[in-house]
Amino acid sequence: MVKACEFCHEKHLHCDPGRPCINCVKRNRGQLCRDKERKKSKKSGVEKSVGGSDAQSSGSSQSNNTAEVNVSADYTAGTMFNNMGFDPLQQSNYGFDTMTRQNNNNDNTLLNSSNNNAIDMGNRWSSQPDVVDNMVSPNITDGSNTVEFDSAWANNEYMKLDELTKNGPPMMFSSYPNSVTENLDQDNAVEDLPISVLPGSKTKNGTAENLSQFLNIGRPLHKTQSRPYISLDMMTAGMKDDILPPETYNTTSLGDNYLSPINSVGSSTNQLNDYQDSIPHQKTMTSPVLPTQSPSSAFNPAKLPTQVSISAISPDDNNEDDQKSSSGIPSKSDKEKNNKTKKAKEKIFKTSPNDILISKKNPKGHKSTKRKNEKADISPYKFRQLVKVPEDLYEKQYLIKPHNYRHTYKKLLEQLEKIFLSDNSPKRRGQLQSIVKCILEDYVPTFIALTSNMIESDLYLQELTLQRTLLELESMAKLVNCSPICIWRRSGEISYVSDEFLQLTGFKRKEILASRRFIFEFLDPTSIVNYFTNFHEYLAFGSKNQMTSNISLIKQGLLVNGAVVRKSNPIVSSSPMCGTNTDGIFDECHLLLSNGYYLKCATCWTVKRDSFNIPLLIMGQFLPVFEGQ
């Protein structure tokens, strides 16, 4: 039959056999979970002896499980009190009124009387085992709390009361001499204790100790007592002679031993010297603080003097004066060394605050050109001389960096303004407005949505993919050498031109690729407008509605398979073209020649995108159209 615990018995709950039970664990009272003691029935003579032996065995097992210090003269006195249901709160004859520290003057008298009474009672009960066997511990039936006096909670409460009712920290048994702790196991332990250790007497700290530390009423004290509360006296109580408080160190002085202790009240000079020798010398110092400036204040160049004092910065010069006074007149070599160092330091510190800031940014004092160098990317012509095969691309990855498209688009706008606004024609101005409108409505929203989650590493990977794809397209262009080919970025910046394109236009390769040149520089204004319209509609991110566009083209009389085509509408194809897996369109344009004339060409524009569906490269194939006069 399962016995219910005290809580489940009181609340009439179903209790499980485990301890602590589930109900106590749920209510965070697992430490208080114990079996409910039932009323003992009257036993015969045989059962009494068995019960007495069980009580003795339980007492011995309890003492063996925990390492305890027996403070009183006889441990059996405390166990007899517990077995007989002794209530120390009601027995004021045993000196428990001294726990409140209200009668400090009579502590010695109460100690002697209470201890003698406790020892006599323990001897009397131990000499009469029959009486002890007949005693039955009464049950506490208050219904709210069944915890006995000899519990850990009661000991903690008395320890807290001791902290509140006395001036100094409690004296632990670990701080007693060995001779005192050895005498505690004897019958006359309290009588043999020295006066400085007896409760109620004054100790080294000028505080009186508690009587409950020597009376064995309740559970014996454990060797490793814990203090689950914080006291302001813990620092002074746990401080040893060779340890100084943090306030005794000076952290503002400069030098190797900048953690030098200051003389404090109550500490001798020898202790300070020993502790200073024990501190390791710190050779690596933090940034020194000027005497005219607080350590917490920020660096302000305007507040610095035009000529900084060397003695305030360097601690070595202060040490030189001490060496001179101790050793007498310095030698000539020492004077020469000191003069050289002083001249060098004066040369350094005889500068204005602005000169100091300029020297930190640029030693030469002129404007930095780092910003210009960052924008100056490697030209396609020079890059192809360094990277010719895919192996070179991976061996020289330091040449790869994200392309500055912002600067490229800025140059593109300047070029478009130069093309369309040079003659102040209303037609050209309207064409430029249509290009800007097409960019803002068709290209920018989708581009921002695709690139909003990209990081710097993605931009690097995008540029690496572009260069690797460009190598493949160049090798393919060399194999298919029947048509002129030009490859440019999505911003229109030319990256590659084939030999046939150079022969068709009459330009040189270095003339096109050595600097930033756009494909729009080689097209007439009408072809530029058509390019932006077709690129944003079909090539940039794919056709918006491929089926709808094909149906509309068929209705307009545009046939994909070779029928007559209107001149103003391009042919859209979704089949693989020129070895790429991207969409392409057919259209016509006018290509600029080196002599200044435009040549009508049929073009095929193919786009290559990355994994983010962002266009990387556009390849244009140009076939000249010779019309008869």
UniProtKB/Swiss-Prot annotation:
Q: What is this protein called?
A: Glucose starvation modulator protein 1
The record's region (Disordered) falls at 34-68, 268-376
Task: List the gene name.
Answer: GSM1
Q: Which UniProt keywords apply?
A: DNA-binding, Metal-binding, Nucleus, Transcription, Transcription regulation, Zinc
Q: Where is the composition biased (Basic residues)?
A: 361-373
Where does it reside? Nucleus
Source domain of life is: Eukaryota
InterPro entries, per the entry = ERT1_acuK_gluconeogen_tf, PAS, PAS_13, Zn2-C6_fun-type_DNA-bd_sf, Zn2Cys6_DnaBD
Is Metal-binding there in the keyword field? yes
